[in-house]
Regions:
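Short loop/turn segments that connect beta-strands within beta-propeller blades
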Residues: 208-211, 257-262, 312-315, 355-359, ...
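Structural motif
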Residues: 201-204, 307, 353-355, 393-399, ...
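Membrane-embedded alpha-helical segments of integral membrane proteins
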Residues: 25-79
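Internal/C-terminal transmembrane anchor helices
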Residues: 83-114
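Extracytoplasmic beta-rich repeat domains
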Residues: 42-44, 48, 173-186, 217-238, ...
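Blade-level signature of beta-propeller repeat domains, shared across WD40, Kelch, NHL, RCC1
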Residues: 484, 507-539
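Short coil/turn segments that connect the beta-strands within blades of beta-propeller domains
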Residues: 189-190, 241-242, 294-295, 339-341, ...
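Aromatic (tryptophan-biased) beta-strands that constitute blades/sheets of beta-rich domains
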Residues: 111-177, 203-205, 213-225, 262-282, ...
Length: 539
């Protein structure tokens, strides 16, 4: 006699089947809501997180109970028995699963904002004759005292440099040990400033730029927690008027004496940006390099309580804060597009022009990228601003239009997921042409390209060089690849012409931008700080 008819599944209890169908649904809905709000951009994201997390936990526990019920049901029936009428319940879960997959897809779709190609014929025509002026430098000759050099454009005005390495590679003047980090170095008044991480402490270090002798270091504890790529600081020190300003990977901002009389570093003021602005460090660490503008030092904490902040550079007192965007990885830059002095900031959600006096928003252009991956520094050329992002985003050239004193950003062209997709490094602009790495982050492939800024026309492309960072000097591109090579390429739109290379480091994460001052090139990886002699007349 079969016992299958006398055994009861939990689903035979009135209401239980419906309940156990609802609970897995709650699990999936909670999962979707949780991930939609996991890196919240606005209050809506926090709401999703608030409701999604408990739904997910409750639903997942219910899902385990449902699995046990399936096992109980299977054991209570013989495989040879005809399917009982109660087995109709297999259809609703199937339909429910299809519907929930569609719902999750909708949530993901709402979080993705693709761009489309655009070209404004009238603005492109005007661009052909437009002046592409660059910001004048106020730094003393022979300095590289901040991120990307005197004008934050990675262009050196030094000449008579040894940048043809096909016959003779450069001479290494010195090597010094350094700990982990991706930050570049700053050179000011014969001294070199760097940051790294030694164990659980971040450090600010000062070296003699000519000899490499360490003069002092300032160390402070810094818990990286779950920070991805936790080797060390990302932001480059800024040196100005006898003071050095730094930002660590978790948002510790310091102002130190650059040249202490007794040789002992002195902390002048400090801010813990993530705590003070009640926000979280981006998954890959705080990367904004401080910008000096007048009496202010400007950084980008990110988050709803002020994604950009300005402090009095002498006292450290907060002067203003602006925007509420999620943080990105770019650094601010100052300029005069549209004939108005402004701070241009590339956040995790868009590009903004801010009044340096009070942080008032002058204009805004949305540019949402996967992982908030807006990393490259904006490039200012006259009344135009060029931006570029990888992660399947693309690039755009914007004209900052001034009508009766009111500014707005108008796209000249937008290239969706093509032409130039800067990842870690920023292009350089020379003689109306962009030189940089177009990176496909889907397969981590990179193409070094030359692009005409005025026409968006690709002049040449080369796949032989691993992606890296680059600067311009004396008619050449000086490229440091992520696998530790230095490569020289002629900066001309005519054709790709390589002028030699030099293996500097055995590394797969050489991401720091080189710095050039007084004919010396300074490079680093996570272990070594190196100085190379690029002077033609050196012996």
């Amino acid at each position: 006699m079969s016992t299958s008819g006398t055994r009861r599944s939990i689903f035979a209890t009135p209401g239980c089947g419906t309940l156990f169908l609802f609970l897995p649904a709650a699990a999936l809905i909670g999962l979707a809501l949780f991930f939609a709000g996991f890196r919240p951009r606005h209050a809506f994201g926090l709401l999703l997180l608030l409701y999604g997390a408990p739904l997910m936990v409750i639903g997942l526990l219910a899902g385990l109970l449902l699995l046990l019920s399936f096992i109980t049901l299977a054991r209570s029936m013989r495989l040879t028995d005809p399917p009982p009428p109660s087995r109709w319940w297999a259809l609703p879960p199937f339909a429910l699963g299809v519907g929930l997959l569609g719902f999750i897809g909708l949530v993901l779709a709402l979080g993705h904002r693709p761009i489309q190609d655009l070209a404004d014929a009238n603005r492109l025509s005007s661009l052909k004759s437009a002046t592409l002026d660059v910001e004048a430098s106020t730094e003393p000759e022979g300095s590289w005292a901040q991120w990307r050099g005197p004008r934050r454009d990675a262009i050196s005005r030094e000449t008579h440099l040894h940048l043809d390495w096909e016959a003779n590679t450069p001479k290494v003047l010195w090597n010094k040990p350094i700990k982990g980090g991706y930050s570049s170095v700053a050179i000011w008044n014969g001294k070199l400033y760097a940051t790294d991480r030694d164990g659980k402490n971040e450090r600010v270090l000062c070296f003699d730029a000519e000899t490499g002798d360490e003069l002092w270091n300032y160390s402070y504890p810094n818990d990286y927690g779950g920070l991805e790529f936790g080797a060390g600081p990302r932001a480059t020190p800024t040196v100005h008027d006898g003071k050095v300003y730094t930002v660590g990977a978790t948002g510790t901002m310091l102002c130190l004496e650059a040249e202490p009389a007794d040789g002992k570093p002195k902390l002048l003021w400090r801010h813990d940006l993530m705590d003070e602005f009640d926000t979280e460090a981006p998954r890959w660490g705080v990367s904004c390099s401080p910008l000096i503008e007048g009496n202010l030092v400007i950084v980008m904490p990110g988050g709803p309580n002020g994604s950009v902040a300005a402090f009095d550079r002498l006292t450290g007192k907060l002067a203003w804060k602006a925007l509420g965007d999620v943080g990105g990885y770019s650094s601010p830059i100052a300029g005069n597009p549209g004939g108005v002095r402004q701070i241009i900031c590339f956040t995790g959600e868009g590009l903004a022009g801010l009044d340096p006096k009070d942080g008032a928003r002058l204009w805004y252009y949305p540019w949402v990228t996967t992982f908030e991956g807006n990393i490259a520094t904006p490039i200012i050329a006259g009344n135009y601003v060029f931006i570029s992002s990888s992660y399947n985003k693309g690039c755009a050239l914007l004209e900052i239009v001034n009508e009766a004193g009111k500014l707005r950003a108008e796209p000249v062209y937008v290239k969706a997921n093509k032409l130039m997709r800067n990842h870690h490094s920023t292009c350089v602009l020379h003689d109306g042409h962009l030189y940089g790495f177009d990176v496909n982050t889907n397969n981590n492939s990179a193409i070094l390209k030359c692009v005409d800024l005025r026409t968006a026309e690709e002049k040449w492309a080369d796949r032989s060089i691993t992606k890296g960072t680059l600067l311009f000097a004396d008619g050449r591109l000086v490229i440091q690849t992520e696998d530790g090579k230095l490569v020289i390429v002629e900066a001309t739109p005519e054709a790709f012409r390589k002028k030699g290379e030099f293996k500097a480091f055995d590394s797969s994460q050489t991401w720091a931008l080189p710095a050039l001052a007084k004919g010396r090139l300074y490079i680093r990886d996570g272990h070594t700080l190196q100085c190379l002699d690029l002077r033609r007349d050196s012996k």
